């Protein structure tokens, strides 16, 4: 009796109830496809979406849990992980809405596509709360391998095959580098795998500073930077985004990136607490490079997907300002920006999917004159792009304001000024697309728009795509005006997470001698 109760308390399986719901949904999708075959495609996507929404409800009910540690200290269901897991689950639900018609039109299996995406979601959600090295690596590989499969899912498209091969080769190298850094951590901590135990052992040895720890830090940051598409580990992003199925790109740009930032916060703040100044310096450099290169190179792109690929690199640079700040406001602004980024970026990709389904192209020049043929699509895409650029009063404006203000309070003046300048640069290439869509002269319309077919909303999967566009449009428009509840949620997730509060206190203590001088 005592033994069983001890095991139950150590496992604390309730901490992964949201992931358990996703697992049940995944099994249900596979079994439903096996039993009912192609006839199941009319209801399997909605079953998956309901399962993901149920998972989000379970996450809501787990808020402020008195016992967040589970699975023998390998998983932490604190409020920070709850928010990141909700972002990933919600991004998957919206992506499935967007992908039904896209996958149907390519003639591939919708059930298998959803199953792979749910597996990636599962890996991302576990990664957000992983509190132990083995758990981190298994979750990371579950997310990565599923992403490789989704990237090459359209087997008949040579561009998809090329994107999958590039992603696999570069991703495998990145995983190997990350694993080597993790193995160094394991050795430096005398065989510990729990992050808090690693931090304690490393801090006790040589004051937490050694060449081995520096090498481990470099290798781990390289692996994380690949996942969040930070320069100079971004080379895969434009080619993979351009060649992959558009719904997959939408998921990678939001869900995978959110998981990467969750990993960065938990791993760096806990295991590398003794070298906080060093990793803050490295991420300052990564933020500068990402903001500059991402937004400048995006100016020269002719493909919408490549433009948004470089845009996502720049957006990662903005988010890193909050990470470098290392304060309550910094971490809160990171979470808030990722919340609003979910809606505006997925909304932009939903519009690109609809346009490509009608015209078969994603060239920016082919959007010329779209307003005359499809005003709703033009409005939705314009609002999402302007929000990404940070135009008030849309959600992206408040997201950037919170990030820049957090950076300014942390005395990161140069980083904030650079962020403002590159944000202005980004507005140019977003507005260029908007201006092209609203040209008034009929002779200025592109050939694709001139031959724009009538939208048949009665086709399978078209209504869900329309719902996805409308939902993201409303969320992007209202999230800016009603930003206070979202920011309160983000702030609560940070202030109630013990590991972040300890890190913030340590950061303040380390700054005292410098200030006194």
Curated annotation (Swiss-Prot):
GO cellular component annotations of the record: plasma membrane-derived thylakoid membrane
Record-given protein name: NAD(P)H-quinone oxidoreductase subunit 2
Species this chain originates from: Rippkaea orientalis (strain PCC 8801 / RF-1)
Enzyme class: translocase
UniProt xrefs under InterPro entries: NADH-Q_OxRdtase_suN/2, ND/Mrp_TM, Ndh2_N
Keyword Chloroplast part of the UniProt annotation: no
Record text on subunit structure and interactions: NDH-1 can be composed of about 15 different subunits; different subcomplexes with different compositions have been identified which probably have different functions.
Primary role: NDH-1 shuttles electrons from an unknown electron donor, via FMN and iron-sulfur (Fe-S) centers, to quinones in the respiratory and/or the photosynthetic chain. The immediate electron acceptor for the enzyme in this species is believed to be plastoquinone. Couples the redox reaction to proton translocation, and thus conserves the redox energy in a proton gradient. Cyanobacterial NDH-1 also plays a role in inorganic carbon-concentration.
The keyword Transcription regulation belongs to this UniProt entry's keyword annotation: no
HAMAP family according to UniProt: NDH1_NuoN_1 (MF_00445)
């Amino acid at each position: 009796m005592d033994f069983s109760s001890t095991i139950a308390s150590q496992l604390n399986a309730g901490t992964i109830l949201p992931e358990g719901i996703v697992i049940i949904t995944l099994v249900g999708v596979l079994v439903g496809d096996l039993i009912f075959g192609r006839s199941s495609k009319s209801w399997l996507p909605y079953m998956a979406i309901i399962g993901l929404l149920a998972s989000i409800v379970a996450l809501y009910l787990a808020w402020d849990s008195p016992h967040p540690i589970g699975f023998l200290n390998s998983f932490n269901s604190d409020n920070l992980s709850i928010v990141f897991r909700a972002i990933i689950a919600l991004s998957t639900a919206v992506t499935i809405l967007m992908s039904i018609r896209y996958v149907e039109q390519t003639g591939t299996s919708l059930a298998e596509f959803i199953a792979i995406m749910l597996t990636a979601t599962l890996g991302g959600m576990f990664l957000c709360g992983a509190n132990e090295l083995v758990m981190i690596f298994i979750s990371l590989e579950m997310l990565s391998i599923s992403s490789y499969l989704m990237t090459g899912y359209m087997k008949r498209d040579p561009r998809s095959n090329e994107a999958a091969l590039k992603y696999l080769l570069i991703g495998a190298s990145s995983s190997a580098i990350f694993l080597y850094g993790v193995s160094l951590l394991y050795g430096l901590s005398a065989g510990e795998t729990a992050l808090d135990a690693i931090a304690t052992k490393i801090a006790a040895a040589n004051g937490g500073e050694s060449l081995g720890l520096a090498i481990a830090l470099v290798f781990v940051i390289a692996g994380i930077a690949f996942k969040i598409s930070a320069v100079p580990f971004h080379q895969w992003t434009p080619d993979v985004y351009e060649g992959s199925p558009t719904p997959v790109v939408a998921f990678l740009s939001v869900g995978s990136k959110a998981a990467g930032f969750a990993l960065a916060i938990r791993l760096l703040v806990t295991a590398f607490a003794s070298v906080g100044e060093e990793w803050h310096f490295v991420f300052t450099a990564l933020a500068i490079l990402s903001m500059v290169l991402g937004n400048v190179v995006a100016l020269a792109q002719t493909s919408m997907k490549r433009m948004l690929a470089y845009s996502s690199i720049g957006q990662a640079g903005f988010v890193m300002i909050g990470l470098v700040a290392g304060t309550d406001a910094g971490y809160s602004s990171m979470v808030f920006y990722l919340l609003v980024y979910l809606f505006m970026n997925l909304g932009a990709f939903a519009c690109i999917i609809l346009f490509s389904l009608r015209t078969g192209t994603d060239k920016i020049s082919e959007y010329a004159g779209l307003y005359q043929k499809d005003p709703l699509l033009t409005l939705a895409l314009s609002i999402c792009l302007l929000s990404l650029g940070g135009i008030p009063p849309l959600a992206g404006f408040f997201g950037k304001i919170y990030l820049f203000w957090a950076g300014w309070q942390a005395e990161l003046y140069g980083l904030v000024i650079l962020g403002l300048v590159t944000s202005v640069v980004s507005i140019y290439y977003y507005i260029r697309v908007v201006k092209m869509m609203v040209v008034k002269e009929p002779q200025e319309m592109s050939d694709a728009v001139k031959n724009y077919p009538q939208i048949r909303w009665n086709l399978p999967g078209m209504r869900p795509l329309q719902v996805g566009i409308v939902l993201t449009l409303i969320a992007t428009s209202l999230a800016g005006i009603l930003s206070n509840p979202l920011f309160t949620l983000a702030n609560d997730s940070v202030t109630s997470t013990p590991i972040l509060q300890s890190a913030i206190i340590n950061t303040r203590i380390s700054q005292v001698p410098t200030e006194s001088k």
